[in-house]
Regions:
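P-loop NTPase catalytic cores that bind/hydrolyze ATP
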Residues: 217, 221-225, 229
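Residues on the lipid-exposed face of transmembrane beta-strands in outer-membrane beta-barrel proteins
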Residues: 10, 22, 95-101, 129-135, ...
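Outer-membrane beta-barrel transmembrane domain signature of Gram-negative proteins
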Residues: 70-98, 243-246
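Non-cytosolic beta-sheet module surface loops
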Residues: 12, 87, 98-99, 230-231
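A beta-strand signature from Gram-negative outer-membrane beta-barrel systems
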Residues: 1-23, 90-92, 105, 113-116
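Outer-membrane beta-barrel channels and translocator barrels
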Residues: 13-15, 90, 101-102, 136-140, ...
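Surface-exposed loop/interface segments of Gram-negative outer-membrane beta-barrel transport/assembly proteins
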Residues: 14-76, 117-122, 128, 132-210, ...
């Protein structure tokens, strides 16, 4: 009995025409608030009255209730949940070039991906580049080189958490009659839109670079030497700011 190695080499196409490909993909993300059973301003005020939140034996309790009652009669019914939202989308563009000839194989690709979140001013943009080169001599040597680069830039929405808007009262307006934002609303609740205009931000970016070189040397039939090496480089930066007014 004997052990051996059988090497099967696929016959390569000697020459191949240049190929160019382009792909565009996109999707739309529309917030759906139908699952929220949200009281309107009139029903919310009545619910609070039945719950005994207003002491009508005091002038303060009586005036506070009537103030909200008058606002509702004038049409006040703020849709707080829609305030920080927008329609988001994802757009992905990719282009590639490939070909082969005279023992050389090459591929180059570029990708740009833009993501706009459903929270206002939220985004994440990605750029990717890749290159592959390979040189092959039949039954002798194969050398290949691969390089990849990726860059990501992102920013979180300054509008805070969506849950902060869900608990707001619809009889409260976010702005006064002069268009100025109101910092504190009924029951000493903070206006979440105030934080969004303070200039707070949380953003960052990252970069990564990878180079890989590999080879295979067929010394004699059934015996070969191969090896590879990789160089990695990456960095990430984050930046945040919270205004003293927050």
């Amino acid at each position: 009995a004997a052990n051996g190695v059988i090497v099967i080499e696929r016959k390569r196409v000697l020459n191949d025409q240049l190929r160019l490909t382009y792909n565009l993909e996109g999707s739309l993300d529309v917030p759906d608030l139908k699952s929220y059973d949200y009281l309107n301003a009139e029903d919310k005020l009545e619910f609070e009255r039945l719950a005994g939140l207003y002491n009508f034996e005091t002038m303060q309790g009586f005036e506070e209730y009537n103030r909200k009652k008058i606002l509702i009669a004038k049409g006040m019914d703020t849709d707080w949940m829609s305030q920080p939202l927008r329609s988001g989308f994802i757009i992905n563009n990719s282009i590639g070039v490939s070909g082969r000839g005279s023992g050389m194989t090459y591929r180059m690709n570029a990708n740009v991906r833009n993501v706009r979140g459903v929270m206002k001013k939220d985004y994440r943009n990605t750029v990717g580049l890749a290159m592959y080169l390979s040189y092959h001599v039949d039954n002798k040597v194969t050398v290949s080189f691969q390089s990849q680069y990726s860059s990501v830039k992102w920013k979180e929405s300054p509008f805070g958490n969506f849950s902060d808007y869900v608990i707001m009262n619809p009889y409260d307006a976010p702005y006064d009659e002069y268009g100025k934002i109101i910092k504190t609303l009924s029951w000493d609740m903070a206006n979440p839109l105030f934080e969004a205009q303070c200039g707070n931000y949380n953003k960052g970016n990252s970069h990564s670079f990878t180079n890989t070189l590999s080879f295979r040397w067929d010394v004699v039939p059934g015996f070969f030497i191969n090896g590879s090496g990789t160089i990695l480089s990456s960095n990430e930066a984050k930046e945040g700011f919270i205004s003293p007014e927050s």
